[in-house]
Amino acid sequence: MLPDKTALPIITLSQPTAEVGAQVHRLISKCPPLDPNSMYCNLLQSSHFSETAVAAKIGDELVGFVSGYRIPQRPDTLFVWQVAVGEKARGQGLATRMLKAILARPVNQDINRIETTITPNNKASWALFEGLAKKLDTQIGSAVMFDKTRHFADQHETEMLVKVGPFKAVQA
């Protein structure tokens, strides 16, 4: 019997460490329309905020990364900063899998809401969070958070605040 050439590679998820910060920086640069951050920022996301981030790898290659943090005034809310999925791993539901992996960690069992910002024309991100809301059996809403003119001085598209929740704890 011939090997199945359509078999998908195994993608492993883990809590990131500072050692993946440079790989995160490279991955995000290859995932437009994501805004690039400094490598230092990516190092902090991978270390200080590792409980609310996830790294996805095929072997030693980083193919996905989600960064987020708990909103200080509302620690039951995860703010998702960025979701990056490399070309090699697209179309496999990896973004949803990564978000659910963060929520399923014992340390995050009290998170019952997600917030993020999405530009109006980022269809992939809208589909991701609309699909996640369905999977979590909850509602989704949006409103302007940062306006193109008022906040970005016409240098960036308007960012819509997207709210998902409330939802029940996600099990591993």
UniProtKB/Swiss-Prot annotation:
Q: Where is the N-acetyltransferase domain?
A: 11-165
* EC numbers, comma separated: 2.3.1.178
| Pfam families (alphabetical) | Acetyltransf_1 (PF00583)
> According to the UniProt entry, how is activity regulated?
Inhibited by zinc and cadmium.
- Name the CDD domains for this protein: NAT_SF (cd04301)
Tell me the GO molecular function terms. diaminobutyrate acetyltransferase activity
EC top class, as a word: transferase
Record-level GO BP terms: ectoine biosynthetic process
pH behavior: Optimum pH is 9.5.
Q: Which InterPro entries match?
A: Acyl_CoA_acyltransferase (IPR016181), Ectoine_EctA (IPR012772), GNAT_dom (IPR000182)
**Coiled-coil residue windows:** none
Question: Membrane-spanning residues where?
Answer: none
Q: Which reaction does it catalyse?
A: L-2,4-diaminobutanoate + acetyl-CoA = (2S)-4-acetamido-2-aminobutanoate + CoA + H(+)
At the top level, the lineage of the source is Bacteria
Assembly, per entry: Homodimer.
Record-stated family: Belongs to the acetyltransferase family. EctA subfamily.
UniProt function note = Catalyzes the acetylation of L-2,4-diaminobutyrate (DABA) to gamma-N-acetyl-alpha,gamma-diaminobutyric acid (ADABA) with acetyl coenzyme A.
State the name under which the record lists this protein: L-2,4-diaminobutyric acid acetyltransferase
